[in-house]
Regions:
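Specific aromatic-rich, kink-prone transmembrane helix
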Residues: 81, 121-138, 318-321
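Short acidic/glycine- and proline-prone juxtamembrane loop motifs at membrane-interface regions
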Residues: 68, 110-121
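Membrane-interface transmembrane helices that cradle and orient dolichyl/undecaprenyl
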Residues: 88-89, 93, 128-145, 326
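Short periplasmic/luminal acceptor-recognition loop of GT-C membrane glycosyltransferases, typified by
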Residues: 351-445, 449-464, 476-478, 483-484
Length: 487
């Protein structure tokens, strides 16, 4: 169901365009340690996800397919792991229920059908969760613990929060200290526990060690700034003092969970008292799993930066602790209501069928990416001449069909710099937003092009200069051109 329509999908938002573009640029320029976006360093994420897209692009020859394969694989692995853990912790029936609950949840499709990094992160979180549960609740199993540690390391170089499964040690330590049944005690194993940290660091070093060596030996100011950005600003500083997606502390509980964790949230009025009873009976399995879910939610709640997909890593733990209660819930609801039971089965089948059908309907309905249409028209109007981009988004770079020039995605005074650049490049064009056109150019000499989701755009050349802008850039512009047709 997660893979329905995968061959029809294409990048549809800036995140998908960005990650696919970075992966394709890696294939083109051969720089695997430092990601680039239109020749400018992309500092926001480590490169493991982009490596994976590049690998699948090389294997399949289909970038639009390669973009969505990591999340699809993550969905398959997560479903299989949930089934196996449910079977081992309780029985085969509970394993099936856990897998179905995961596949029934709205957020599963919202995340795993997108070509974004959070679907790929789910793979490492689930492997970390699986290894920790096998060790802490079904162990001792040191091999699985080290698998979990390696997965967390790879999760960290995918997206910084890949360490989340380690939070399971907190409720586990409490359960061990209080003597709760259902958890495995492993006294006198301090060295083995610390070895897990070494395994996680070794996984991180797969990327970080070559990066540091490269920057130390051959790096310039930009690459050194990248190391500082990715290790400090994009991790601890972004968590403690987020500058994007700022939301109040109640955001996840009032705006995200009621919608994106459907239909699971509908059962919470019965589940919460049942969990309380299980905890009163000192069930260590429930304490560790439910405690981990609460800690993950708390972790993201404490950060001022919040997006709806951030809490997705908690979902596998939630369905695993819910699954044993589902048979009891179904008996409670439908034992004396055979007609209601038939309605419930019908609704469940419709729910799964609707998500499967939507996988094919959405890509057909969305059809061509608006920025792809924009850049195709621009290439035709300019006859493939050099193009200066201003206030651009990733789709304009990804779908460019001609050489592009820019002063940096977040540079100041981009329109003014474009006007100055055109004076020394009279055969080139610049793509200017409508609301900034009159600042530096004569509107009557500008040509309007296809609108995209970012608004109206106009093409100008040096003859449209109104002489009002004199903002010379202190640095040379970035230049980039796709060497081969890629999409």
């Amino acid at each position: 169901m997660v893979g329905a329509g995968i061959g029809l999908r294409q990048p549809g938002n800036v995140d998908e365009e960005r990650f696919l573009g970075v992966a394709l640029e890696m294939l083109q320029n051969g720089n695997w340690l430092i990601p680039h976006r239109a020749a400018e360093i992309y500092p926001d994420k480590p490169p493991l996800f982009m490596w994976t897209i590049a690998l699948f692009t090389r294997l399949t020859g289909a970038p639009n397919l390669a973009l969505f394969l990591p999340a699809l694989i993550a969905g398959v692995v997560t479903t299989a792991c949930l089934y196996d853990l449910g079977k081992r912790l309780w029985n085969r029936r509970i394993g099936v229920i856990a897998a179905l609950l995961f596949l029934a949840t709205y957020q599963t499709y919202s995340v795993l059908r997108a070509g974004q990094i959070d679907g790929f992160l789910c793979l490492w979180i689930m492997l970390g969760l699986y290894g920790m549960v096998r060790h802490l609740l079904l162990g001792p199993a040191w091999g699985w613990f080290y698998v979990a540690c390696a997965a967390m390391g790879f999760g960290i170089i995918s997206k910084g929060v890949g360490f989340l499964p380690v939070l399971m040690l907190i409720p586990y330590a409490y359960a061990v200290r209080k003597g709760w049944p259902g958890v495995v005690r492993m006294p006198g194993q301090g060295r083995a526990w610390w070895l897990g940290l070494g395994v996680a660091l070794a996984a991180i070093a797969v990327w970080l060690l070559p990066l540091v060596l490269y920057v130390t030996l051959y790096g310039d100011e930009a690459s050194r700034a990248y190391v500082s950005e990715i290790l400090l600003r994009q991790t601890a500083q972004r968590y403690a003092n987020a500058w994007h997606h700022q939301e109040p502390f109640w955001y996840f509980f009032l705006k995200v969970i009621p919608k994106y964790w459907l239909p699971l949230v509908l059962a919470l009025p019965w589940l919460v008292p049942a969990w309380r009873r299980q905890l009163s009976k000192r069930d260590g399995r429930v304490l560790v799993l439910l405690g981990w879910v609460v800690l993950v939610l708390l972790f993201f709640t404490l950060s001022s930066g919040k997006r709806k997909l951030y809490i997705f890593p908690a979902l596998p733990g939630l369905v695993l602790v819910m699954a044993p209660l589902v048979p009891w819930l179904l008996r409670r609801w439908f034992a004396q209501r055979p007609r209601a039971r038939k309605v419930f089965i019908g609704l469940a089948l419709f729910w799964f069928a609707a998500w499967f059908a939507r996988g094919f309907i959405e890509p057909i309905k969305e059809h061509l990416n608006v920025r792809q249409a924009l850049m195709a028209e621009v290439a035709g109007m300019t006859q493939g001449a050099e193009l200066m981009l201003t206030h651009w988004r990733e789709g304009q770079w990804l779908f460019a069909r001609q050489p592009i020039v820019h002063f940096g995605m977040d540079a100041a005074h981009q329109t003014q710099k474009a006007a100055d650049w055109l004076r020394s490049n009279p055969t080139a064009f610049a793509l200017i937003q409508a609301d900034e056109l009159a600042q530096c150019f004569k509107p009557d000499k500008a040509r309007k092009v296809e609108d995209d989701s970012a608004g109206e755009w106009f093409l100008v050349q040096g003859d449209a200069d109104n002489g009002q802008c004199h903002e010379r850039s202190a640095s040379a512009p970035f230049r980039f051109a796709w060497q081969l047709p890629h999409l």
